[in-house]
Amino acid sequence: MEQTFFIIKPDGVKRGLVGEVLKRIEQRGFTIEKLEFRSQVSEELIDQHYQDLVGQSFYPPIREFMTSGPVLVGVISGPKVIETWRTMMGATRPEEALPGTIRGDFAKAAGENEVIQNVVHGSDSEESAKREIALWF
């Protein structure tokens, strides 16, 4: 069975969206394999998670945002879970996310010099899922 990794980001936790996101996962028929609340995430872990972005000029605000508050991390499984979860999340940019997706319904567009607050993260490939699951768990 295919697995993927997800994060409910600090904005999702702060805004009380954990239950809504988990409900959507369960309603889709996916199995929640692992779930862990992290009250604080280190900069080192975020740097490892976003290793391809470290060094980019836009990265420091992402690191600051991802370490700004608690997150919920998890592993879900099911048929075509990576592709389906990414569809359920919606486009990264809130203004491009369709209504009915998590980001379309709940994400907030970023103002100038602000980080997009798009509620959730999901692995973009099987390789990324394996790497992220091993990193966080």
From Swiss-Prot:
Catalytic residues (UniProt): H121 (pros-phosphohistidine intermediate)
GO cellular component term, pick one: cytoplasm
Keywords annotated in UniProt: ATP-binding, Cytoplasm, Kinase, Magnesium, Metal-binding, Nucleotide metabolism, Nucleotide-binding, Phosphoprotein, Transferase
Catalytic activity reported: a 2'-deoxyribonucleoside 5'-diphosphate + ATP = a 2'-deoxyribonucleoside 5'-triphosphate + ADP; a ribonucleoside 5'-diphosphate + ATP = a ribonucleoside 5'-triphosphate + ADP
Protein localization: Cytoplasm
Gene Ontology terms for molecular function: ATP binding; metal ion binding; nucleoside diphosphate kinase activity
Required co-factors: Mg(2+)
Subunit structure as annotated in this protein's UniProt entry: Homotetramer.
Protein name: Nucleoside diphosphate kinase
Phylogenetic classification of the source organism: Bacteria, Bacillati, Bacillota, Bacilli, Lactobacillales
GN (gene name): ndk
